[in-house]
Structure formats: C-alpha cells, structure tokens
Amino acid sequence: MAPSVISLRSHNSFSLSVSASCIKVADTQDKLIEEWRVASASQEPVLLLGEGSNVLFLEDFLGTILLNRLKGIDIREESDGWYLHVGAGENWHQLVEYTLKCGITGLENLALIPGCVGSAPIQNIGAYGIELQHVCDYVELLDLTEGKTIHLTTEECQFGYRESIFKHQYRYGFAITAVGIFLKKEWNPVLNYGDLAKLNPATVTPQQVFDSVCHMRRSKLPDPVVTGNAGSFFKNPIVTKQHADSILREYPNMPQYLQADGNVKLAAGWLIDQCKLKGFQLGGAAVHEQQALVLINKSNAKGSDIVELARYVRNQVAAKFSIQLEPEVRFIAAHGEVNAIEVLS
C-alpha cells in the first residue's frame, strides 16, 4: 500500500492534520463507479466524502477518499410548486441562496448549513423547525458495484431525527447522486425558534427569514474557515416526558420541545452549558465559548483530543442529568466509519 501522504486538512472542517493514501474527484456517475472499482479491486478502503463538514477523522485514512462532485440544478415549475433535481455535489447553502434569487421559497430556515446537497439526506439535516424530509421528494442513489441507479421516495428514505436509511442499508457501496426537492408555491413561514419568533407571520418575507437565520447562525456558531469545527457535535436528546419533568422541577427555564409521540426533545447545548463547560479545554480541543454544542479545534488538535473532550462532555451530562448524548458527527478511523457511541463509551 502507498504511504499516507495526501493531506486531508482542507477536506475536513475540523481542519485536522490527517492524511489519506489517495484523493480522487468524481464529477460524473461513470467516474464514481470507475474510481470505486479501482480502489475496491486493490483491496483498499474507500470513503465517499462531500465537503467533510460532518466528519471527525480519528487518524490517517489508509485508503482512497472519493469526492462526490456531481453538479447541476434542474427546476420544473408546476401549478402548485417547483420540482428541483439537484446534483449531490452542489453546495447546500448556495442552493438555498439560488432558490431565493429565483423567487422559490421554502428552504430559508436551512440557510448556512454546511456541506453538500448529497450529504443532506444522510443526516436528514434540519434547523429552526424544518428538516430535509419536509421538502424532499426523492433521492437518487448509485449502486457502485452493480452500476445501477436506485430511486427512493421520501418514505423509503426512512427519515428520522438526524437519521435515514443511508446510515444503515445504503451506508457502504452506494453514492447519493441527486436529491429531488419539492417546494410549494403557497409559502407558510416557520417561525417557532429563536429570533424567528419575533417576526410577524403576517408581514414577514422569505428574505427576512433567510437573513434572520444567517444572523443567528453566524452570531453563535464559529466559522470553520477560521476555527475548525463540525457544527453541532451532539444530537439533541429525546427523553420521556417523565424524565423531562424531573429535570424541569430543578430547572424550570429548561428549553423543551414536545414531540408527536409524547416524548420530549431537549437542547443538548443547554445541558452541556449547565455543566459549566463553555470554554473547557482538553489538549488542543475545546468547547466553544458561545455555543456549548460545538466542539472546536482550538490549538492544533488531534482527532484523539476531540474524542477525549467529547467523552468528558458526555460523561458530565450523563452524571448530572442521566442522559447519554449521541454524536451527530460521523467518526472515521483508518479503514472507514466506526460507531461513534462505542468510541466514546
């Protein structure tokens, strides 16, 4: 095997100094299949990557990084709305901006979420009351071994909170090539979270929602270009109402969001903040001083520094609230993705 010599610093938003044996760029489906088969034939591990905004490299990757750069935005207008067919390699935030400029509304709450369009279904990205599943029409997937295209409806994607079938059945050997999005012409602003609740639903415009979301994200989340991070490190935990009520008795101002099934979603950042961990540092990694949900590469951190910090944060929250936080970020070891919860346990 070739030595690990190609830097991945610019391909992971934590800006960790890790490397790979090889990096290949695929801008067509044929190229994706070809590079996958070449790497697989040499018995090397292969990792499909978008913009590396939701991964933590624990160490050097001993194989090929395959960058999915399939582009293109096709828009079809119908009487009730717009149907978009978007290449997996398109930047998500740029798509949100583009639709707004075209007078197409519905993606404003998802502004400034980092990463590629193809990564959006994997996590079922969401923010400020909207998730991808609310606007997703279908996902196109490529079976890299058979060379066949698979068309999945929204239901078949099995979307959940930061969850989808792409983390399970289609995790390895498949590449998302395009995402279908349907946006209704009848615009109903979702103004339930943060500063959006201050806006008047009767007069607010899509541009104002977009601007407000961008302002909120920029004010509390560090720019990965300046400070290495992967955004929200942990998922917001969902607990029983009984568990939430027991915490509420001691912390009556705790933010909580009742779910359709009767359970309650809590704010992971708030839980971490109650443990007085903002600014806490281990090795080169630290908890961000403004947003406790974000772990940062403060000073030439290694992957192991971020793991140690995440484990410490998780243990503190568990000790105080009897809640086990789950990472939202995907953990990548030398030969591929590993179970993040097992790494932290």
Swiss-Prot record:
* Entry annotation: catalytic residues: 162, 232, 328
Check the record and name the Pfam families matching this protein.
Answer: FAD_binding_4, MurB_C
The pathway it acts in is: Cell wall biogenesis; peptidoglycan biosynthesis
Q: State its cofactor.
A: FAD
The residues covered by the FAD-binding PCMH-type domain are 16-186
Instruction: Write the Enzyme Commission number(s) for this entry.
Output: 1.3.1.98
Annotated keywords: Cell cycle, Cell division, Cell shape, Cell wall biogenesis/degradation, Cytoplasm, FAD, Flavoprotein, NADP, Oxidoreductase, Peptidoglycan synthesis
What's a BP term from Gene Ontology annotated to this protein? cell division
Q: Which residues form the signal peptide?
A: none
What's one GO-annotated cellular component? cytosol
The UniProt catalytic activity note for this protein reads: UDP-N-acetyl-alpha-D-muramate + NADP(+) = UDP-N-acetyl-3-O-(1-carboxyvinyl)-alpha-D-glucosamine + NADPH + H(+)
- InterPro entries per UniProt: FAD-bd_PCMH (IPR016166), FAD-bd_PCMH-like_sf (IPR036318), FAD-bd_PCMH_sub1 (IPR016167), FAD-bd_PCMH_sub2 (IPR016169), MurB (IPR003170), MurB_C (IPR011601), MurB_C_sf (IPR036635), Oxid_FAD_bind_N (IPR006094)
Task: Give any GO molecular function from the UniProt entry.
Answer: FAD binding
Q: Which PROSITE patterns match?
A: FAD_PCMH
Which cell locations does it reside in? Cytoplasm
Free-text function comment from the UniProt entry: Cell wall formation.
Protein known as: UDP-N-acetylenolpyruvoylglucosamine reductase
Q: Which organism is it from?
A: Pectobacterium atrosepticum (strain SCRI 1043 / ATCC BAA-672) (Erwinia carotovora subsp. atroseptica)
